[in-house]
UniProtKB/Swiss-Prot annotation:
Protein name: AA9 family lytic polysaccharide monooxygenase E
Positions of O2 binding: 179, 188
Leader peptide range in chain numbering: 1-20
Top-level enzyme category: oxidoreductase
Swiss-Prot/TrEMBL domain comment: Has a modular structure: an endo-beta-1,4-glucanase catalytic module at the N-terminus, a linker rich in serines and threonines, and a C-terminal carbohydrate-binding module (CBM). The CBM domain is essential for binding to and subsequent oxidative degradation of polysaccharide substrate.
InterPro entries: AA9, AA9_LPMO, CBD_sf, Cellulose-bd_dom_fun
GO MF: cellulose binding; metal ion binding; monooxygenase activity
Use case: Lignocellulose is the most abundant polymeric composite on Earth and is a recalcitrant but promising renewable substrate for industrial biotechnology applications. Together with cellobiose dehydrogenases (CDHs) an enzymatic system capable of oxidative cellulose cleavage is formed, which increases the efficiency of cellulases and put LPMOs at focus of biofuel research.
Disulphide-bridged cysteine pairs: 58-193
Keywords of the record: Carbohydrate metabolism, Cellulose degradation, Copper, Disulfide bond, Metal-binding, Monooxygenase, Oxidoreductase, Polysaccharide degradation, Secreted, Signal
Residues annotated for Cu(2+) binding in this entry: 21, 99, 190
Organism: Neurospora crassa (strain ATCC 24698 / 74-OR23-1A / CBS 708.71 / DSM 1257 / FGSC 987)
Pfam families reported for this sequence: AA9 (PF03443), CBM_1 (PF00734)
């Protein structure tokens, strides 16, 4: 009886923990909803915990998608996170389970966003991190980027620098959950790369860092006890590029974060491009059929609102995993 009870408790905790995981999966450009058209949505909502792995680039098991979202230099994009694939409702927190931590956004200039593997240099264009809440007794009680994300239905508005050159970029949105970060390897990182094509702009050349390499497991923004009182917090990685922006944690929803509603505003159409059949990020599947695009094994290939490639790489087929919401290559 006791064994059954313990097993049940463990199962319940694991289920609750899994439910608290999340993915960035949709993109808005100047208030227009592009959904997941240009997002390399991870096949799982589980986090990356090894900051030395290639999965730090665009998450585990991700591959290029068939489209790129057009973005004007100096405009705003809004990244959107939710716990479950294709669930864009506001009924649940974007990432629950007291997964408090910063929200960071990077860009990487690439020759072709539909084939880039994330190995090029990255520069940080945005952060919403931490702010002390008066009279708080622990970091859990303070203001965090994740709390802002949860308050704004998973949305975070980000300015694209106006002085960067035109061309293709990977846009990398990231949450670092710090609820178990008091020990090495405990931080949970959730990231998604979006494929975008920037028009306009200038000739600036921001300094860059590499993933992996930009973070260390011992960084004070990675190894930290948020359950104790905090007097400061410094996010890992480089400073925000001068042409980027920051948001003060706890400052409330702004712009598209509060006004953009799924199904009640303008929508955008991303440009279709041929996609290589090989995986772009470490951990992704390989293989592929001939011509056009193909989706790597275990990647999304269909479902409600999905507009990406529907052909699976050689050796796998597109199957409904959670019909009608989600299908993946298996």
């Amino acid at each position: 009886m006791r064994s059954t009870l313990v097993t049940g408790l463990i199962a319940g905790l694991l289920s609750q923990q899994a439910a608290a995981h999340a993915t960035f999966q949709a993109l808005w450009v100047d208030g227009a909803d592009y959904g997941s058209q240009c997002a390399r949505v991870p096949p799982s909502n589980s986090p990356v915990t090894d900051v030395t792995s290639n999965a730090m680039r665009c998450n585990t098991g991700t591959s290029p998608v068939a489209k790129k979202c057009p973005v004007k230099a100096g405009s705003t994009v809004t990244v959107e996170m939710h716990q479950q694939a294709n669930d864009r409702s506001c009924s649940s927190e974007a990432i629950g389970g007291a997964h408090y931590g910063p929200v960071l956004v990077y860009m990487s200039k690439v020759s072709d966003a539909a084939s880039a593997d994330g190995s090029s240099g990255w520069f940080k264009i945005f952060e919403d991190t931490w702010a002390k809440k008066p009279s708080s007794s622990s970091g859990d009680d303070d203001f965090w980027g994740v709390k802002d994300l949860n308050s704004c239905c998973g949305k975070m508005q980000v300015k694209i620098p106006s002085d960067i050159p035109a061309g293709d970029y990977l846009l990398r949105a990231e949450v670092i959950a710090l609820h178990t970060a008091a020990s090495a390897g405990g931080a949970q990182l959730y990231m998604t790369c979006y494929q975008i094509s920037v028009t306009g702009g200038g000739s600036a050349t921001p300094a860059t860092v590499s993933f992996p390499g930009a973070y260390k497991s011992s960084d004070p923004g990675i190894l930290v006890d948020i359950h104790s009182a905090m007097s400061t917090y410094v996010a890992p990685g480089p400073a925000v590029y001068s042409g980027g922006s920051s948001k003060k944690a706890g400052s409330g929803c702004v712009g598209c974060e509060s006004t953009c509603k799924v199904g009640s505003g303008p929508t955008g159409t991303a440009s279709a491009v041929p996609v290589a059949s090989t995986s772009a990020a470490a951990g992704g599947g390989g293989g592929g059929g001939s011509g056009g695009c193909s989706v790597a094994k275990y990647q999304q290939c269909g479902g409600t609102g999905y507009t990406g490639c529907t052909s699976c790489a050689s050796g796998s087929t597109c199957s409904a995993v959670s019909p009608p919401y989600y299908s993946q290559c298996v």
